[in-house]
Structures are given as C-alpha cells and as structure tokens.
Swiss-Prot record:
<protein>
    <recommendedName>
        <fullName>UDP-N-acetylglucosamine--N-acetylmuramyl-(pentapeptide) pyrophosphoryl-undecaprenol N-acetylglucosamine transferase 1</fullName>
        <ecNumber>2.4.1.227</ecNumber>
    </recommendedName>
</protein>
<dbReference type="InterPro" id="IPR006009">
    <property type="entry name" value="GlcNAc_MurG"/>
</dbReference>
<dbReference type="GO" id="GO:0005886">
    <property type="term" value="C:plasma membrane"/>
</dbReference>
<dbReference type="GO" id="GO:0051301">
    <property type="term" value="P:cell division"/>
</dbReference>
<keyword id="KW-0472">Membrane</keyword>
<feature type="binding site">
    <location>
        <position position="250"/>
    </location>
    <ligand>
        <name>UDP-N-acetyl-alpha-D-glucosamine</name>
    </ligand>
</feature>
<dbReference type="Pfam" id="PF03033">
    <property type="entry name" value="Glyco_transf_28"/>
</dbReference>
<keyword id="KW-0328">Glycosyltransferase</keyword>
<keyword id="KW-0131">Cell cycle</keyword>
<keyword id="KW-0133">Cell shape</keyword>
<keyword id="KW-0132">Cell division</keyword>
<comment type="function">
    <text>Cell wall formation. Catalyzes the transfer of a GlcNAc subunit on undecaprenyl-pyrophosphoryl-MurNAc-pentapeptide (lipid intermediate I) to form undecaprenyl-pyrophosphoryl-MurNAc-(pentapeptide)GlcNAc (lipid intermediate II).</text>
</comment>
<dbReference type="GO" id="GO:0051991">
    <property type="term" value="F:UDP-N-acetyl-D-glucosamine:N-acetylmuramoyl-L-alanyl-D-glutamyl-meso-2,6-diaminopimelyl-D-alanyl-D-alanine-diphosphoundecaprenol 4-beta-N-acetylglucosaminlytransferase activity"/>
</dbReference>
<dbReference type="InterPro" id="IPR004276">
    <property type="entry name" value="GlycoTrans_28_N"/>
</dbReference>
<feature type="binding site">
    <location>
        <position position="295"/>
    </location>
    <ligand>
        <name>UDP-N-acetyl-alpha-D-glucosamine</name>
    </ligand>
</feature>
<keyword id="KW-0961">Cell wall biogenesis/degradation</keyword>
<dbReference type="GO" id="GO:0008360">
    <property type="term" value="P:regulation of cell shape"/>
</dbReference>
Length: 364
C-alpha cells in the first residue's frame, strides 16, 4: 500500500498522522509513505526526524475579513493544487489522508480530483475550515467526537477515534510513577497545561501550593520549559511541600499518564483521546485562545458523559482547582465512576480502525 499523508501547522494535526503511519508500518511492513506539509510548519522538522519522506507546498489560511491576503491565498491554493498533483503523480498513492491544517486542503482536493481514494481525519468536536471544505470531495470523514458528526455529510462519516490513543496503551504505569518520583501506594494527580505550559494554570498552582502540602495525595506539576524558572522562583518564596513534585517537561508522558489517578489539563483533542483510552478521570481547563472555542466543546463531550469536570479559565483559582481535585480524588466512588465513564468513551484501537477504513477504500 502506498499512502500519501498531509496535515500540519500544529502538533494536533501532525502527531495523529505519525501515530497512524507507525500503526500501518506494524500491520503492513511493505507500506510506503509520502508526507506533504509546509516548509515553515512544525511538520517540516518533526516528519523527517521520524524517517518519513517529506515534500512541501506553499499555502496559507484565509483571513476572516475581506483583504488582499485572501486573493493571495486563493492563488497559493491553486498553485498548491498543481504542485500536489505533480507529487501525487510521481508517488502514485493508493490512498490519500488529510489530518487537518491548511496544507491538506490543496493536497487532498488534488487527490480527489485525480480519482484517488481520499479520507480526512477530524480530531476536534468542531471541525476546522479545511476539513469542512474537503468533506464535499473526499470518500470518507473519520471523526473522534460524536459532536463532530453533524458537521459532515452523514453517509461519509466513520467514528474511528484518534490514532494517538493507540500509542498510550500497554505502558507501564508503575515505571512511569517511579520515573518522576511519585510513590506507588499513594493516589496522585498530574497537572499540566499542554506541551508549552499555560501561565493561568501555573498561577493557580503556585497560589495553591501551601494547601496542597496538607493533602494525602501527591501532586506532579509540569510547568512547561519556558515557565519553569519563574514558577520555581515563586515556589521558593512559599516552600515546596514533600508531596509536590515540579518538572519543566515530561518526555515519557504516556507512561506517566498511565500511572496517575487523575489528570488536570487543557482539552486538546489528543489529550482527550489519550485520557479516555486509558480510562483516566480529568479536570479540564479548556484554552479560551483557540479557534471556535473548540477546546470547550471538546471538554463538553467528555463532561456530559461523566468522565470529567470542566473548570473554565475565568473561574480558575487556587480554591476552585483544589476543590475539583478533592471532589474526585478523595471520593473513591466518584473516582471509580469517572474511570468507567472515561473508559467507555475511549477508542484504544483508533489507529487500527482508521487503517481498516483505508483498506476498504483501496480494495473498492
């Protein structure tokens, strides 16, 4: 099978694509891949590092206001379609999959126009502009949230989940806890604000640190590398309780996620896919700075099923943070109920499900 993949701009579009590629390689070692992204996007460094052949096109997103930039964007799109057709003819894929971001617009559109089987994968509960546009032309739309289904043609939608979920399974949680200094018998909560950290969450954590010192559970706090020195400076003034561990970054996040009892985090699509696959209860603090407020809508999908609590950033204080953690961690029944609810939402074999959809299209 020859697979052309496109997606970029943010890790949320790139990492699911890489997880899918790794799964396909396991199931079909003969498979060949080409990834098309942009020269300036994260994908231009992440994808080649993963050993996957990479080509780039020039593309930009539409501005919401009428402007000359949008004329340039249309011109770039048309040029991107031509460049994509050239790469497609040269690589001769059996199937093309787009995982979101502006770049997959011209790539997947070009493939559909050339009569090649096409899929888009939508990670969020509210679809991005590119995937909504492409849904008119592709054969299938793979989604991760029930809330996303209504935005696409019903006959094309398949619920597959996020391939990243498959990568957190079969991790050693005890090893994960040990690696960061958490003790095995005690309950623990992991608090983090995404790969780069989040200042409002840092502020609430620092404010709460003295009260955390009185708790029976342990707290692992990940600041994000850019915030670490500032947080540690503030912590030094207040004192660092023995049950609170602070790290700038965690390189073995799937292992650590497996080991902890509760997670406090943003509500990015990849994070939620991992948490539900593992059956982890969570307190979700959606980022209000994302397009279409999609993190709050992602969070709502999990909260409504009883697998998480939602704490809006505007309501985030030391008191509300501790309150929500205590209500889950200190109540065994609540913790257990939320674990079961999360597990029921999870799709741990998401990468395999997506590969099955691809196989069916190729064999049509």
């Amino acid at each position: 099978m020859r697979v052309l993949v496109s997606g970029g701009g943010t890790g949320g579009h790139i990492y699911p694509a890489l997880a899918l590629i790794r799964e396909i390689k396991k199931l079909n070692p003969e498979a060949r891949f080409l990834y098309i992204g942009t020269e300036n996007g994260l994908e231009s460094t992440i994808v080649p590092k993963a050993g996957i052949p990479f080509q780039s096109i020039v593309i930009s997103g539409f501005k919401r206001k009428i402007s000359l930039d949008n004329v340039k964007t249309v011109m770039r799109f048309l040029k991107g379609v031509q460049d994509s057709k050239r790469y497609i003819r040269r690589f001769n894929p059996d199937i093309v999959i787009g995982t979101g971001g502006y770049v997959c617009g011209p790539v997947v559109y070009a493939a559909a126009k050339l009569g090649i089987p096409t899929i888009v994968h939508e990670q969020n509960s509210v679809p991005g502009v590119t995937n909504k546009f492409l849904s008119r032309y592709v054969d299938k739309v793979a989604v991760c949230f029930e809330a996303a289904i209504e935005h696409f043609p019903e006959s094309k939608v398949v619920m597959t989940g996020n391939p990243r979920a498959s990568e957190v399974m079969e991790q050693n949680g005890m090893k994960g806890k040990r690696s960061v200094g958490l003790s095995l018998p005690k309950k623990s909560v992991l608090i983090f604000g995404g790969s780069r950290g989040a200042r409002p969450i840092n502020d609430a954590f620092v404010e709460a640190i003295e009260q955390f010192g009185n708790k029976s559970y342990e707290i692992l706090y990940v600041t994000g590398e850019v915030h670490y020195d500032k947080v540690m400076e503030a912590v030094k003034q207040k004192g660092n309780p023995s049950n609170v561990i602070i790290k700038p970054f965690i390189h073995n996040m799937p292992e650590v996620l497996t080991g902890v009892d509760l997670v406090v985090s943003r509500a990015g699509a990849t994070t939620l896919a991992e948490l539900t696959a593992l059956g982890k209860p969570s307190v979700l603090i959606p980022s209000p700075y994302v397009t279409n407020n999609h993190q709050e809508k992602n969070a709502r999908s999990v909260v409504d099923k009883g697998a998480a609590k939602m704490l809006l950033e505007k309501d985030l204080t030391a008191e509300t943070l501790i309150r929500d953690i205590d209500e889950i961690l200190l109540d065994t029944q609540t913790l257990q109920n939320m674990k079961l609810a999360a597990k029921q939402l999870g799709i741990p074999d998401a990468a395999n499900k997506l590969y099955e959809v691809m196989n069916k299209l190729v064999k049509k």
